[in-house]
Amino acid sequence: MIRRGLLSVTAALVLLSVSCSAQETMGCADRTAINDFNATLYMGKWYEYAKMGSMPYEEGGVCVTAEYSMSSNNITVVNSMKDNTTHEVNTTTGWAEFASELHTDGKLSVHFPNSPSVGNYWILSTDYDNYSIVWSCVKRPDSAASTEISWILLRSRNSSNMTLERVEDELKNLQLDLNKYTKTEQSAKYCAGAEHVVGAMLSVAIASLFALLH
């Protein structure tokens, strides 16, 4: 199961994901976002279960969540994470919009006030009620390399084994390497002080990633 799989990631991979800004590859993989995306069903709160790639400022961050709500012309994004050392909760608010005019696929563009860059947010798989697998990749302007990041989002901090098994199957179907994901702390011990805050630094990671690359 994914719970055991993520916990079995080697120490070297864990250290690598913390010290590197994100997963580097030679060119972005040819991936496809879902083509029948229902934005209304996707709204609400999501908990970051695990991520592939990491931003430097995320070190020590726990209880990562993201909350989405529909507004008049876009999607409001409220993100937060709790600093495991200072116990402070950091939040930010941005917005997302469809990357295409059809508004039928899971390709979104994410914007934040303090970032001049736009991050891509591709939903590769979701059942809306339990899980979502999100992916982002951008080619570096100064080389042939690209930077890839991905998140596993769940609707609750403690999801069932059935949901986790479904996620693992979807990762295999998407040809995403389970061992490159590191689990995000979401236990009640660490997250009790963050329950009153809506959101996580999920989309901030995208915005900061693009800021570093431009």
Curated annotation (Swiss-Prot):
Q: In Gene Ontology terms, what is a biological process of this protein? A: response to reactive oxygen species
Lipid tethering residues (GPI-anchor amidated alanine) = A192
Q: Keyword Protein transport: yes or no? A: no
Spell out the SUPFAM superfamilies in the cross-references. Answer: Lipocalins (SSF50814)
One example of the protein's molecular function in GO is: pigment binding
Q: What post-translational modification does the entry describe?
A: N-glycosylated. Contains disulfide bonds.
Q: Which residues are glycosylated?
A: N38, N74, N84, N90, N130, N158, N161
Propeptide stretches are 193-214
Q: What does this protein do?
A: Putative role in axonal outgrowth and guidance, required for the navigation of identified commissural neurons. Could be a receptor the midline morphogen.
The miscellaneous remark of the record is: Named after the main character of a 16th century Spanish novel, Lazarillo de Tormes, a crafty boy who guided a blind man.
Name of the protein this chain belongs to: Lazarillo protein
